[in-house]
């Protein structure tokens, strides 16, 4: 299933809860935002100007690729990403991904995509939080 993720409207999927909101970046706040994005793997900050709506929550598609931060824009098969992160095979087909109309933006608990990463020039961020209920 493909479920839209809209600002200010929490989405419940299985044991996950997703929230999204846009925030204007205050002058000099880049280093704080960068630290926040690195500290919590269940929150993602993206440059909202680089995101191509609509934003959706869905399961990965077979053969899909992902360009995580730290790979200089290069992509890898999502199956290889899962193997490298040691995600059990039985969870892979059910694991939620956040995507725009062209690509995976973020895998909750892991990295966001390099093409939408925040930079010192970012004016507005898209903040997405994922909570995994016990």
Question: Predicted segment positions?
Answer:
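AMP-forming adenylation/ATP pyrophosphatase catalytic core
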Residues: 1-134
């Amino acid at each position: 299933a493909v479920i839209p993720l809209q600002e200010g409207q929490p989405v419940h999927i299985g044991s996950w809860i997703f929230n999204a909101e846009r925030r204007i970046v205050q002058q000099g706040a880049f280093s704080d935002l960068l630290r926040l994005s690195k500290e919590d793997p269940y929150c993602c900050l993206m440059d909202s100007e680089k995101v191509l709506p609509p934003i959706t929550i869905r399961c990965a598609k077979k053969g899909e690729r992902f360009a995580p931060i730290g790979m200089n824009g290069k992509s890898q098969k999502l199956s290889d990403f899962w193997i490298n992160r040691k995600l059990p095979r039985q969870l892979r087909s059910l694991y939620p991904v956040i995507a725009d109309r062209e690509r995976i933006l973020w895998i909750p608990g892991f990295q966001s995509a390099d093409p939408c990463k925040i930079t010192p020039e970012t004016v507005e961020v898209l903040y997405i939080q994922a909570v995994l209920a016990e």
